[in-house]
């Protein structure tokens, strides 16, 4: 449950900038919402000493509700359009966009939930999730400042809190972020990517998250269909530990 440190530091820092940067409000909403889901899972698992916390369906329902509220905000506020910026074609104002129309709604769900669970899968090896998330959040901070997007305070807060956390999370780890940290961070990265129009580059910058997720999908799919495991253990970072 060490992720409470990251979440608390990020939220408190961001609150100082809400008046001047109102765009960080929806990011805080999703980050805290996903963090609460993770906290409940960790509390049931550790605090109540249960073998498992929330089951996958319960987590997914919570994630769907929070993402749905955020998506409704996007579509009604006009904060962003229904297009995705094609990488390396320009910035917000002069870049080329892939207009998805109504498909933008399921795309947002896919991006946010995919990122959230990808970060969650990556957590489990000392310093791995923290270091990769620092790289992605730093990239987003540079973009946020360069595009004057109005969300740089929260991206910077994420980087700062993670740098402090990493000191105690590298091998041998003294503190672990748990689901409260990984789900909060995953939700934040997904939402930030949408608001910055960097959905495509998220796949590149967060390549480790993609690989971890695909390893779980392949492992589960292979076992269900053929009764055989591809990896000794999934997500894939556990395969290389054994």
Regions found by a protein language model. Name each.
Residues 1-6, 58-63, 130:
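Select subsegments of transmembrane alpha-helices in polytopic membrane proteins
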Residues 6-39, 70-77, 82-84, 88, ...:
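Alpha-helical transmembrane segments
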Residues 20-26, 47-62:
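Membrane-interfacial loop-to-helix junctions in multi-pass inner-membrane proteins
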Residues 36, 60-69:
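Hydrophobic alpha-helical transmembrane segments
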Residues 45-55, 86-98:
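Membrane interface segments of multi-pass transport proteins and intramembrane proteases
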């Amino acid at each position: 449950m060490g992720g409470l440190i990251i979440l608390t530091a990020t939220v408190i820092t961001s609150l100082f900038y809400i008046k001047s940067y109102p765009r960080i409000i929806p990011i805080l909403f999703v980050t805290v919402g996903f963090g609460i889901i993770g906290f409940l899972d960790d509390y049931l698992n550790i605090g109540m000493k249960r073998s498992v916390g929330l089951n996958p369906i319960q987590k997914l329902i919570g994630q769907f509700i929070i993402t749905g509220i955020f998506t409704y905000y996007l579509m009604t506020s006009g904060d962003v359009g229904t297009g995705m910026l094609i990488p390396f074609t320009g910035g917000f104002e002069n870049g080329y966009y892939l207009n998805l129309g109504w498909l933008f709604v399921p795309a947002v769900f896919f991006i946010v939930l995919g990122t959230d669970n990808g970060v969650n899968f990556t957590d489990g090896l000392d310093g791995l999730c923290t270091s990769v998330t620092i790289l992605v959040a730093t990239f987003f901070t540079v973009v946020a400042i360069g595009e004057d997007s109005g969300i740089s305070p929260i991206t910077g807060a994420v980087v700062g809190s993670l740098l402090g956390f990493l000191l105690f999370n590298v091998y041998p780890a003294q503190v672990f972020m748990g689901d409260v940290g990984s789900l909060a961070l995953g939700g934040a990265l997904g939402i930030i990517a949408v608001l910055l129009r960097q959905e495509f580059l998220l796949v590149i910058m967060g390549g480790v998250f993609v690989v971890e997720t695909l390893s779980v999908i392949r492992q589960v799919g292979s076992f269900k269909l053929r009764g055989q495991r591809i990896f000794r253990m999934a997500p894939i970072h556990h395969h290389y530990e054994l």
